[in-house]
Design a protein with these regions (language model features):
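A glycine- and charged-residue-rich anion-binding loop/surface
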Residues: 1-284
């Protein structure tokens, strides 16, 4: 997957603050306030497609360290936003780019979890379910979708069970760039209605290899799994997610529902709390 190298070398191409480019970090107009660094390449994920940005650092060993608190795309460029901890960063400096794995890991879990949840919603509620929005944060995932009625407890249980079956089976997650025209032929492919996608487009599939799909585009087998257009970060195997627990279901607009869920350590904590509460009720 893209962005998977935890550390990589890059060169500073620009220093940016308050709509101005400067030659080095000593020349930023507003000292003490965050500014941006543009690199020739990066392993950090900029906020996009509902997934929150990576954090991390840009380091010149022993000479300078820049703490990255946010990564955003601005006019097609990836801007690393943050604060200089010490030293000076100049245009053409070589830096080590390090993302924070402790933040990236739950983001990966929650993003692949969102794909699994999307598939489960369609399977249990019907093909009319379309994604209306999403949030992938380290602590939770949120998914908005088209559906006219509240999702009842039995349906939520089925969706959660189907999601956890994917996780327990510990199947591979695949990603590959394909031409938009070819990718749109894959049966069961999920995309956000009205969204403009690049060409080529990145296809992320669970269990079946995207390269295998590309050789047999119309095979109905592909309907039996999650296949989506996506440029985000994902786990390599579904077992890494640990568990998915739905914590909330609500209506946010006419014909639009919202589900909030947690994965990994957060899911274990929520389950433990629920079990303790159930035990206390039993004891009353």
């Amino acid at each position: 997957f893209k962005y998977d190298t935890p550390s990589m070398q890059a060169h500073v191409k620009a220093v940016f603050q308050d709509h101005k480019f400067v030659s080095d970090s000593d020349s930023v107009p507003k000292v003490g306030e965050p500014f941006g660094i543009l690199l020739d390449q990066t392993n950090m994920y900029a906020e996009s497609g509902g997934q929150q940005a990576d954090t991390g650092s840009l380091v010149i060993d022993g000479k300078a360290e820049f703490e990255v608190t946010d990564v955003q795309v601005s006019n097609g460029y990836v801007l690393h936003i943050g604060f200089l901890k010490y030293g000076t960063l100049r245009v053409d400096d070589q830096v080590m780019v390090n993302y924070d794995e402790a933040r990236r890991r739950p983001l990966r879990n929650n993003h692949t979890g969102t794909h699994i949840l999307n598939f489960g919603l369609r399977e249990i509620l019907g093909d009319h379910v379309d994604q209306k929005g999403s949030l992938v944060a380290p602590t939770k995932l949120r998914f908005d979708f088209s559906h006219k009625a509240p999702v009842n407890v039995a349906e939520l249980a089925k969706i959660e069970d189907m999601s956890n079956d994917f996780i327990k089976r510990d199947v591979n997650v695949y990603g590959k760039d394909m031409s938009l025209e070819e990718a749109q032929k894959i049966p069961g492919l999920r995309a956000v209605f009205g969204e403009s996608y690049p060409n080529p487009v990145r296809v992320v599939a669970i269990e079946f290899d995207v390269e295998e799909m590309a050789k047999d585009l119309t095979n109905p087998r592909w309907r039996s799994t999650s296949v989506e257009f996506c440029g985000g970060t994902h786990v390599r195997r579904t077992g890494e997610i640990g568990r998915l627990v739905i914590t909330e279901e609500s209506g946010i607009a006419k014909g639009t529902r919202r589900i909030v869920a947690v994965t990994g350590d957060e899911a274990s904590e929520v389950s433990r709390t629920a079990e303790e509460a159930a035990q206390r009720l039993e004891d009353i």
